[in-house]
Amino acid sequence: SKAELIIAMAQLQHSEGLIICNGYKDAEFIDLGLYARQMGIPCFFVVETLSEVLIIIERSRALNIEPLIGVRIKTTVAVDGYWSQDSGDRSIFGLSTANLMELVDRLREAGLLHCLRLLHCHLGSQIPNIRNVRNGVLEACRFYSGLVQEGAPMCYLDLGGGLAVDYEGARTNSTHSMNYGLDEYCANIIESIRETLDP
């Protein structure tokens, strides 16, 4: 919300933190984020629909302030667990591969591809199987690498969701459990990123 963005701007005025703007973004919200950028606050707009990028481009031109842009991608990895029906290609959030390429084309045409610096994906919710987490991170890294090859100077990989709670205490990959601990979760994410992005 605009109120939350104003609070974040006040807190980060003399900090090295980032503001990541997900969710609904209208022209006023984008203007506010662009003013934050003008103040030296790194405020990213995470594009979740193609219509958002048109508003970002238009407001950026009107205010003559370059945006910081991120993109939320929809991975194809279907995950196990309670939310499996809404995972992978069936997810309603994020851009598909075709939409991602259209975003890149629109930013390139607008001369703003250099503003695309962050890739975000939400791996899922309450993922019981560590293999699903690893596969999701590997796919996100391939998207990240593809954006670099397209000419975007990527800097940030923002991985959300996934970490489960072992409600059963069974340490299995059943719907209400998890077959990994926090250390293994973190290690798998780091190893997957190194495996894909570290030359």
What are the residue ranges of the model-derived segments?
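Active-site-proximal beta-alpha core segment in soluble small-molecule metabolic enzymes
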Residues: K2-Y156, V165, G181
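Active-site anion/phosphate-binding pocket segments in diverse small-molecule metabolic enzymes
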Residues: E139, G161-P199
